[in-house]
Amino acid sequence: MSSNYALPDVFRAMAVLTGALAKAYSVLPNDSSKTSNASDVAEASLDVARAFEEASQILKTAVSSPVVARALSETQNNGTLHDQLNSSVQNIAKASTEFSAMGDIFKYQAKAQVSLAQIKACSNAQCSPETVESNFQEAIRDYEAASSIALQYGFQSLAEQLSDAVNQLKTALSNYEKTVATLQQIKQAQASGNYWQVLNLALSLASNQQNTQSSKNIAQAANNLKSALNAPLNSNNMSQYYSNVVSAIQSFPRCTQVSTLVTTTSAVIAIQRLLQLGSSELQKAQQATQALLQSAEQMWSSAYNHAEKAYEAFSLAEQLASQFVSQELANEIEKGLEKVKQFVAEAQANMNANKNILADAFNTVVDNISNAVNDLMNWVNDLIETHIPGIVGQILAGVVDGLIFVVISLIPGVGQIIDGIIAFSFISNLVEQGIIAVKTGYGAQFLQQLEESFLQPQNIAMIATSVIGGIGLERVLADRLPDIRIGAIDAAKEKIGDLMSDFKEKISIGLHGISDDASKVLDDIKTKIKGNAVSLRDVGSTIVEKKIEVKAPDITKIDVKPEEITAKNVNVKLVKPLSTDLAKQLSEKFKSVKNLKDLKAIVKVDKEFRIPYDLQGKSMGDKTVLTADYMEGEVLGLIKNYEADVKISPTSFEKTIKGAELKPPELHAKLSSFDYTGKGILDVEQDIIDAIKTSKDISLTSDGKGVAITTDKATTIVPVKKYFDAIMTGYAKGDFSDVKVAELLSKVNSSDLARLMTDDIIKKLKDYKGSGELKIGDLVIAKEIKGDKTLYSVAKIGPDGKPQSINVVSDIDDPMFRATVYNNLLDMVKNKTEFDYLVTNLNKMKSLSPDLQTTLDRLTVKPGERSISIEGSGGKYLNVTEKSLPGGSEIRAETNLEGVKAVDALEKELDGERQATLEQLLESYKNGGFRDVKALADALGKIDKLPDTLKEALAKYFDRKMENSSLEEEVDLIKGLPKMYEDLKTKVIDPVDTFLNKLKAKGAPESEIDALRQLFYKRVLNEINAGRSLDTIDLASAFVKANEVLDKVDDVVKDLKDRGLPDNLVNDIKASMFKQIEKDVLSGKPLDINRIEFDVLRQKEDAIFNFVLDKFGFDKNLLKNLTPDQLDRFKTNVVDQFLLKHITDKNDLMDEYNNIVKGPSKVQNTTQPSATQNTTTQPTAQNTSLPGATQNTTLPTPSKVQNTTQPSTTPNTTLSTPSTTPNTTTQPTVQNTSLPGAVQNITPKDLQSIVKDPKVLDEINATVEKLKDLGLPDKLVDDIKASIFKKIENDALSGKPIDINNIWTNILMQKEDAIFNFVLDKFGFDKNLLKNLTPEQLAKFKTDVVTDFMTNRIVDKTDLMQTYMDVKATVKGPGTTQNTTTPSVAQNITLKDLQSIVKDPKVLEQVDATIKRLKDLGLPDKLVDDIKASMLEQIKKDALSGKPIDINNIWTNILMQKEDAIFDFVLDKFGFDKDLLKNLTPEQLAKFKTDVVTDFMTNRIVDKTDLMQTYMDAKTLVKGPSTTQNTTQPSTTPNMTPPKIEFKDQNVKPPGTGAGTDVNTPGSGSQTVTSGSGLQLLVKPKEIAAQEEKIKLKDLQSILPEETLERFEKLPDSLKEKVIDEIETRLRGKKVDEIEGIVNDVIDKYEKLYDSAVKDGMLNDLKNLIDAYSKKDNNATEVLTDVGKSLEVLKDLNKSVGTSVVEEAKYNSTLQTYLAGLGIKDLNNVSDKQLIKIGTDVTNTLSEKFGTPVVVLTPEEAKILVKELNDTLNDTGLNTKFKIEEVKPLPKTLEVILATLGIKNETKQRILLKELQKKLPKIRITDLIVISSKGTITPITWDDIMPTYYTNVQGQTLPIYTTQTTTTHHITPPPPPPPPPPPPPPKTQTITTTTQITPPSPPPTPPPPPPPPKSPKMPASLSPSSGNAPSEAEAEQAEQVLLI
């Protein structure tokens, strides 16, 4: 059927199919410790199905192709050939149909594998029987369908095997159900201690075999076992009983799934009987010792006999336990043996003593042993109970794995090539793993046996269900494949080679024939495996004992002939020690060539090269001999790159194709025609040596049996053996050097020779590894590479620069041969995409015709040109053109392949030794030696596609393992990358996907999925960073954390829904929480769900507040009665109390309102005696004392926390106005007025909702009770309690760990003065005595009094006076404590003296431990000695006074005393800039000092970064009195600039002329920002009620590098303010070491935004939209028309906005999540429709954000919008080109818009409104603006109204309108044009405003300067006055009239 060579598509189909089949085999397990992944098998099955379908289509197309028609036509005159070809066509058509059917079969198989995967999953989980049964039934149905198709198309054998699989599944299901029931009975029997029942049930499981013979064998073994166990046992036959039991246990088959259970249970039964017998014998010995009228000697003799029997029984039981159960059990029995030995020794020693002593000793032994026996039985019960439950799952896993193996083995299409490998791999693995080998004994450990038996369940299940019968030793292949071309076989061999790679390190392959004995043994094995699965044990025994040789195919020895595919065989020695040699060789070779960059680039060419041929032919009968003259230029040398023994042999031309198989004399005669002289065959070694020495070329003859030695005079052919002998002889004589020998051997390279030279080759590779980098890609091979046979020669460039002659012989006259060659050449080239494939196949065709050019020339039908073109990936191409020339042809090749070089002679690149080395490398590559490179490349490709987090994790893991590795270890690591990837996939990717898919199936949104995925991947990266190994990573805890996250979010959502919040708001809160979760995970923050909930609820405060007011019908007009500060607190309190369910109706809401209204005035009257004299309104809340901001705050915002952390620090600090003198020393009133109020609002219930840990409140309550017991006043107790609550709340909300002891210490230090004064007053201490103390003594006395009082050491005035005297006596002088007093004290207190007083040695040990800790912290010796002396002095004092010694309390006291010294040391140690302390208030400094000392002592400050973080925390969280008491609306702190609000109102006096003075602005009132970097303030100036502390430039200069500051300065001025604004927001709550990254990120963002938005032209589109609204009149039709036009303009605007959002989203993960919510994931492919959708959503959101409750858009409100919109432009940086010039002062409701357009009639407005709402649902704020590119802002004035401004939580500055109120405003004029005169100082202006609002007409544009615009009246219909506006009923009536 050679005619198939004319059908290239057939071969292509075979290649596709063969590759898919080989890939399917790759999912098989390569050793018995691994199992196939069912999902991989399903995927492979789908691949095969697709391959069959593709092959079917290819074949269907092929039979109708022009090639087939031409072949049938041309062979009409040749009947035989025509019939053969026609038959082939029919067969291919039939194959097309059958392949389609096979595709369906494999589809069903894939479905079945999915069901099997579910069953396998049940082996690791607790699945219900119904689930398992359902999956079994699904698999059965799919296999039945596949079997039906196979039967329909005549695949009889395949149908039978599929039917067998169905039966096996049914049997497996039945066995599963029986096994579950039986195991339940086993557990019950075991629980009751009935081991006989356990054994019987286990034996019933073992005998449940399908195979009759197997069942009989097990049944017989079971009977033998039970007989041996139940045999009579007495003191005389113990040894025989033991021997019989051991023999029966060892004879029981080990191949069943319960064999270990049978073995263990049998041993336990026997042990139990032996222990009971031993106990009985001991009792008899005991009775003997109690017998009367016996001497001690008689007692001893009788007792000894019984004890000896007992010892024997215990000893046999111990041996059974050690051999079959557990070494632990054996050890316990050994203890009994020791007790018997002890008894014997005691008995012998007391033989002549009183017999009662003997009896007592015996009783003790017997009792102990009896108890031990009972304990042992209980222990065995527990052990078995632990391991029984897993058997069901393990059996299920085994059944499924067995079926996977069977089903894969059914894949047809590869034939004996796969058969042999599968047989070999299965048998060799079973032997290698010891599964079927005879074992002399079993493990001593019960757990090891159980693991060995059940952790390889595939072996159990395959045997138990007779699955072994289908392992593929008998292949089902109805029709053998037709001829397969070389390419297909190459593909098959490459894939099959992958299967062999795992075995190469276990076996040694020799090139020897297989013996008949080995063949027979293999046949026997096949028979046994097919017939009796249980006898595998015997099979393994035969293999191991006889060391016989089992045949397996050598992958390089394959013959391909028309009708068959056969494989030559080599012996495989299954002797494990032989495996190490080859494994070592392969490892060394791989290591030596790991620098080869591109193993495929063997031949490279210039971008254009030419192959000129000038050939002349000489006729020699039926042969053609060709020569090539010398020529100038370079010649392409083709590489022999094919398997040496592969022959393409069409039967009719077999002799020709094999080449000129001429005998040596005949070949000699042919060669003589080339002017060579032949001397015949040489027999003399010296002649051969001489010929070699003078040779020009040496090559192997075509038959591989001779060597052709070419000299100047002749070519001599000698046998290979003589050639080798001559080389060895010449080497011995010194004629040849080592290098020359290597070169000569390489000339005739063969597999045998390669193996002999392995060590030498390896050595050379190592040498060249060090001497120079060896890169095949840099070497252009112009020389033939020798193989086992030389079938051709090529021209090469000689030493003289000219090519040597070409000597070739071939027969190409036969027409059919010419057609075959030409068709194959084109077919192999035209469909391929790689250049090296062309080279490979051209070489293969040259093996058919030694001169390719002559072949092409002879085959040319028409003169002229023809070409072959190949297009590869990435635009690469290769064109080969043939042009006929006189006397020959020219081949011209053009390519654009990169990195190619001109052809160079090999001799110029390498010396002889390197040539040999390179040839060996290429030979290894050809034989698959570097196949691991492909697997490595595939793995790297997969790794590159991993998410960044996982990629980073894997890279760090790999880098860590590479550190300090040897070269060989590094090679193994690189080779292990595929395994690392699979571990990552198995351990991380697959489990995470499974978990998330379950969530997705439950309807979880994408935001949840993305956040959780990042959580898991971040967890993996953290574990890798922590040093964990991939194979130990366990995501179980991460899944638990994820569930906690989901549960918490669900709880929040449920609570919000329970409170009645609308769904859209609840969903918005939920989405915001997940966005924050994702952000925290990505940034590496610890996940604090409580903090996230708190932050999100604060963000949504306004929406929730409005909802509550509407829900309970609150009159919003009441809000006008509140000051901005009161409104802010009311809003916060309402939201908090509503969520905590404290507000449930309108009454509760009104109570909250009344509390706010009444509360602040009281505070004002107590803490601010002098109010501002220039204001007429009531003082606002922000003028009150500090605690006023927190009295009603349960869950405060961060800004509020900062203002309320420390209400008071020292008794010398008061909260007063600026006029208060600093000499005031009275006690503060804050403690008595404000903090109790805070306690009332921070309830334990509220705090518990934040803290979650119930122990915290218990500890607080205990502390408070202790304070009350000490008699402290209630107010002081409440003050302390409030401070503790506030500190806990702050720590919980900021994510810090809550340390009650630390908090208590800090609060105690803060309240020291108050407690001190209380104690002095309580015990009547004369405070005049304090004048006698130095400042140092007073400080120590104060600390000691408070500490001793709190620890009950001061209980009366005597104790107090003693403390006073001690302090006065011990603390001397004005200097610091550590420098003057305690060192001298320490000199007088020796440890010995102190120990004699203290008595307790642990006290001094604790002191030593404390001192050691101080030294470890690096404190100076002098300070440490000072602290030690102080501690010893206090200990001495306490000991002498009889007080209990409390080291912790003493340590706390000393720490407080030495706080200043330690604080200074820490600052100096870390290089802290002490100038920064000037920025702190006294309260902040006190907290900073305490925190520094505490955190340094507890290792929380370890570097400067930690110290700076503590500084920032103290600066942020603690506010001094001056930060609030001096603040009045709307003034600002000296470092802040108020908003520039400009008025063109003639009634407003210019700055500097008003009489009023801002209470916060002493002097001129001018407040400006100094020039320089905008980072000086880091915040945009805003006018807010409670100023927040800002990070100043000076703070940042120690953090930010110069490069960052320079980048900021280079920004456009218009962008700087926005950058600063965002930096402020993002720096809140951040650590110091995060600041630099955040600042750089913000600068990056705005640089990119600027470039993006300029290109978008967004402002032009926006302008078009505005222009559309400039032509409105009274005509409603025109209005509607304009609205329609505006909609089109609006689309353009929205598209532009959408484009900007998409561009920013490319580097903004938050926007990516937002767009994903809109269904847009591919940011590089967004349609116009999607862009419009994005823009619409964004502008809608912005419109909602800009909305305010004010009805009329006033000029001031217009200014706010100008500012907000210009800020929006700042976001994109477009403010340098465009600014919002004007915001039209139009009303914002649609009705008023219509009125402004000229439609005055209210009913008409309603009608038009309905029409507008249909077409344009929302009029946006942007619809009302006018844009100018002049860069100016034209403010609009309105004379009659002036709002009061306030700043809400979000930082928005909004107006509030009050009736007849006068407000003082701070006015800053705009800067005049350059050159600017000095600006006049700003002054205040009193303005009276009313609610009578009259909108103006649009201002005219007269020439400058413009007159003040007039103020037209508002239409009556729109006036807010209720007297002028028509009622709703009147409007409705008017509308009805108009409609009628």
Curated annotation (Swiss-Prot):
Residues 1160-1239, 1519-1571, 1862-1940 are annotated as: Disordered. Residues 1186-1200 have a biased composition (Polar residues). InterPro entries: Formin_homology_domain. Residues 1868-1883, 1895-1912 have a biased composition (Pro residues). It comes from the Viruses. Keywords: Repeat, TPR repeat. Residues 1164-1185, 1201-1235, 1521-1539, 1561-1571, 1884-1894 have a biased composition (Low complexity). TPR repeats lie at residues 119-153, 155-186, 480-513, 617-652, 1691-1724. This is Protein ORF1940. It comes from Acidianus two-tailed virus.
